[in-house]
Amino acid sequence: YECHGGLTDLLGVADVVIDCSPGKVGASNLEKYQSAGVKWVFQGGEKHAMTGMSYTSSANHAENLNVDGTRVVSCNTTGLSRTLVPLYNHCGQLSVECTMIRRAADPGDSSKGPINAIKPVLKVPSHHGPDVMTVKPEISINSMAVAVPTTIMHVHVIVAQLPEGHGLTTESVIEMWSKQPRIILMNGGETGITTTAEVMEYARDIGRKWGDLHEIFVWRDGVKLEGNTLYYFQAIHQESDVIPENVDAIRALMGTESDW
């Protein structure tokens, strides 16, 4: 295929545009898409207020059916939703506190940092928890975040309060997640996969292009339910977990799939 023409030519033949421009740039493109009558999908770097709709497959596919446009939430919000939404659907109520241990930069972003520091996000809560409520407002969630000098993954430390009478055990929570798409559960002690570096080596070992891991990774032996309090860790490959969400968002906007 020979690439030629400009944005006007593209919008003349497109049904939907996935806008992956840098954060806060997409707003300048919105009017162009609307004028051309083209549907649009922005990314998590844009604000929910700009689009009025946000999307993640596990939380609100149906609400996004046939809309003019939406915003796929960030990699972290996507990862939180994948494990929290099944819990909410079972319990009918959920209160969550989480800490996001964020990679400092993507592997190719050599100009970013920190390099030899841990940098807290001093805006509390960080945007990640409130962003979950743009796709599942019934979940009560707050988050804090720190950036650490690594490039390969984020890690979430999650404490979820379940309601009385939830009927779950540590084992049944793990079983629930094992039935969900886009979640990988492994026992770190048994497999030796106890760090994010080893998780990404696993992605390469199973033949994923670019070493991508579209699923989120939950350590089985890091899951513990004590009474009504659930503790767990999960790892997020920030470069790839939203890719299938964008594909699902296209299907929702075009009305071709009623369920993700």
PLM features: residue spans?
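C-terminal substrate-binding/catalytic lobe of Rossmann-fold NAD(P)-dependent oxidoreductases
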Residues: 1-4, 94-95, 99-233
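Generic surface-pattern signal
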Residues: 16, 137, 178-182, 251, ...
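Glycine-rich loops and low-complexity Gly/Arg-rich segments
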Residues: 42-44, 64-68, 121-125, 167, ...
